Regions:
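A short C-terminal boundary segment appended to hydrolase-like catalytic domains
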Residues: 281-309
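N-terminal active-site segment of His-dependent metallophosphoesterases
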Residues: 30-40, 44-113
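Short acidic, glycine-rich surface-loop motifs adjacent to enzyme active sites
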Residues: 200-218
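Short, acidic Ser/Thr/Gly-rich low-complexity loop/linker segments typical of extracellular
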Residues: 2-17, 21
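Extended active-site neighborhood of metal-dependent phosphoesterases/phosphodiesterases
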Residues: 33-39, 43-46, 113-201, 226-239, ...
Length: 309
């Protein structure tokens, strides 16, 4: 089982024991969910106030995973509204493995609302969040005096990058690199972790990446900085799922990666798409999806015109 502080990755021994050396930039120790298991404790430990001498995680075997998950994006919600109750009601009858909320939860009020009213316990299924550009908040510094725009997000949801595994598929959660405030991390930090994480899984493992936007470009997914190039085509990426653009969009790039953008479930899209979320099914190397539109009020309207006199 892989354990990480976001910078280094180590694997436990057969008994689940591990040793991890942290840095002054480490904020969380995270257990990357192995296939066939479910957490009985939080999947991360907050070490921002200090590193404990020992850390324990709980796992239990689980054979009821469906391979299905839901994505929504850009909810930008500050007030608890009816659509949230409607979605929770839907989740009572639709069994999925997790819900991915891909960014722009939106500013401190939105982060606080979602963290308190739209979390794993409230929705009844694991909630997976990614950090969007409007989730970086000004006015925060870390202990080293660096800009720390991701702090309010971390206070609610924990680490901004990590991975987990379900039914043989490897899911990577990654953050937006820029936004309304400056984060303490750099593109190199994110890309270094992505490289280590991808190299920690067996070759050929299908991978799905979540982000609020697109790292690199939709055609090639080649991630570059002044010091490195990370070509995601060298790995078995089957899906890249994001939001940010406020449109429903599904495109297969030249490397065969499905690029899938989804609008908000509470206000529709810039392309005039009605409010919706997306239901995915991951079956080995096959990733399919379908849109589910927000329930339309049961109202009828008619128009007509008078012909002749």
């Amino acid at each position: 089982v892989v354990v990480s502080d976001g910078f280094s990755l180590v694997k436990t021994d057969a008994e689940g024991v591990f040793s991890l050396e942290t840095t002054d930039r480490s904020r969380f120790i995270t257990l990357y969910t192995p296939t066939g298991y479910r957490h009985t404790t939080p999947f991360y430990v907050d070490i921002r106030e200090g590193v404990p001498s020992s850390v324990s995680f709980g796992l239990v075997g689980a054979d009821d995973y469906t391979g299905q998950f839901i994505q929504m994006s850009d909810i930008e919600e500050r007030t608890y509204l009816d659509w949230m109750d409607d979605f929770k009601s839907y989740m009572e009858i639709k069994k999925v493995d997790f819900v991915a909320m891909t960014g722009d939860i939106c500013y401190a009020p939105g982060l606080q609302l979602t963290g308190s009213e739209f979390n794993t316990d409230d929705v009844g299924v694991r909630m997976v969040y990614t950090l969007g550009n409007h989730d970086l908040i000004k006015g925060y510094k870390d202990s080293q005096g660096r800009d720390y725009g991701e702090k309010p997000y971390e206070d609610q949801f924990g680490p901004v990058w990590y991975s987990f595994n379900i039914k043989g598929v490897h899911y990577m959660v990654t953050p937006m690199l820029i936004g309304d405030a400056t984060p303490s991390y750099t593109p190199d930090d994110v890309y270094n972790w992505m490289r280590k994480d991808l190299e920690s899984i067996p070759e050929g493992t299908p991978v799905v990446i979540f982000n609020h936007g697109v790292l690199g470009n939709t055609e090639h997914l080649v991630l570059k900085t002044d010091t490195q190039t990370l070509d995601l085509s060298e790995y078995h990426i089957i899906g890249y799922i994001y939001g940010h653009n406020h449109v429903n969009y599904h495109y297969v790039n030249k490397n065969g990666v499905q690029m899938i953008c989804t609008i908000a479930p509470n206000k529709g899209g810039n392309d005039h798409s009605p409010s919706s979320w997306r239901l995915f099914t991951a079956d080995g190397e096959k990733l399919t999806n379908e849109l589910h539109y927000y329930p339309i009020p049961k109202q009828m309207a008619a128009t007509g015109r008078v012909v002749g006199g």
